[in-house]
Structure formats: structure tokens, C-alpha cells
Amino acid sequence: MLNFCGGETERLAMRLDTAVFQRGLTDSREKARRLILGGFVSVGGQVVTKPSFAVAEDAAVAVAANDDFVGRGAYKLLAALDAFSVDLTDSVCLDIGASTGGFCEVMLRRGARTVYAVDVGTGQLAARLAADERVVNMEQTDARTLTRESFAVPPDFCSVDVSFISLEHVVPPLAARFDCRFVALVKPQFEAGRADIGKRGVVKSAAAHERVLDGFCMMLERNGLSLSGLIPSPVRGGDGNAEYLAAFSRESSDFTPDIRAVVRSALA
């Protein structure tokens, strides 16, 4: 475990994303944050994936590779996997709302054996992913129509990142058919009532965000699912909306979210 302590060193400690930016290793702190989440930054020769990790002023910080994910959404799933301690090694994964494949690529880099990339659209999956033998491209497919027979091997893990439809209509049918771990991206702009959605589709009210998350938690409970983690997404939606990442499954959990604190952090 990396640990920097002691009087002078502790006094000079700073966030890793700040250190990467200030040392000129990237052109913005946001870029530094993405590189760290992507596993491209090491401290003292050890990879660190937490942007807030404290490093000493004289610590050896290095950027090992360029950021080359096919989509910015990759950083959302990376944050979730780390926050919720999800290990995808040799897993069969289901990527609902695959689009260009940001989540799909993260799953592969984290050791997934097979990824089923499901999307209602067509021709969106990045060429390098469509050509990867570990990826099964299931375009023009409505996730709500999937059954156990849709897959040779049932999924161990399922991510859900959908737009223009509420999770209320997507999660229940998936959870009823697949007994696996889930991580869903909760997007207030597609869950809130019309009165809560402002100009350009942005939901700004903290109260509206809290209502969305409360409703999401109640939906899980109604469907026999237990929430095991909830964090703000490290990357906002393309329209500027704050979003959330939730982990859940049929396995019982004693996790109780502090929704107000999560929303406050997301909107800060």
C-alpha cells in the first residue's frame, strides 16, 4: 500500500490529479483525472486509480500511456468498478446501451472473458471492439426482450447505461431474468418529472435529484433488489447533467445510502 506520512511530507501532500497537472504531465486537471481513473498513472512505480490520492511533493509520478478509450463514458464505469470493488476477471459481461463501447472496453481491460454489447441502434460500436473476438455485437436489440436463451453462458455482471427511457422500464425485466451483479448509470434527465427539467434538459434542483434517487431505490426494493453502493459519476453527461452510479443485485445488503450527501457532492 502506498503511504506518505510524516511532518514535512504530509504538509506538502497534494491530490494526485493536481500533481499530474501541475507537473505538466497533462494539459488539464480533468484530463489528469481521466488518466488516473483509466489506470495510466503510477506513483512510485505502483498504479493508483484514485484522483484524490495524496502524494508528496517529491513523489515519483509517471503517466504510463495515453488515454485512448473509445468513449468518455469509460471513466464512469471505471469509477464504479473501483468504488464498488467489482472484479471482472474471467467474467461474462452484459453491456446494456453499449453505444460506441466505452463500458465494453473497460470490461475487456479489466479482464472480462466475453462482453455482450447490446444497443437498440446500429453501426455505433467502435470498429476495434466490433472486431474483437471477445465481443458479441448485439445491435438493434431491445434489452427488454433479452432472455436466458439469448446467451450461451449467463452473464456474471451487467452494466446499464440507457437514454430517453427510465430505468424503471429496463432494470426490472433484466433483473428478473439474470441473477448477476449490476451497475446502472442513473440519469436524472430521464427520470425526473417535466417540471424538474430546465433549459437544455438539465436538472439543477438538488431536491429533484434526491427524488430521482429515492424513486430509484424504491424501484429496486419493489423488484427484490438490494442497493450495495451509490456514488456521483466522475464525468457529467454531455448536456451537463450530474449523474450517479448505483451497484445492486439480488444479494441482500445492509448498505444505506446518504442520498442528500451524494447529491450534494454531485452538484458541487
Regions flagged by a language model, labelled:
Residues 188-205:
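Short, glycine-/aromatic-enriched active-site segment of Class I SAM-dependent methyltransferases
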Residues 100-111:
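Conserved SAM-binding loop of SAM-dependent methyltransferases across substrates and taxa
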Residues 168-183:
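A short glycine-rich, Lys/Arg-flanked "PGG" loop and its adjoining helix->strand segment in the class I
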Residues 116-165, 169:
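S-adenosyl-L-methionine
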Residues 89-99:
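Conserved class I S-adenosyl-L-methionine
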Residues 73-91:
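Conserved alpha-helix/loop element of class I SAM-dependent methyltransferases that forms part
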Residues 4, 8-59, 92:
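A basic, amphipathic helix-loop patch mediating RNA/tRNA/ribosome contacts
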Residues 242, 250-268:
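Flexible, glycine-/basic-rich loop-and-beta segments that form/coincide
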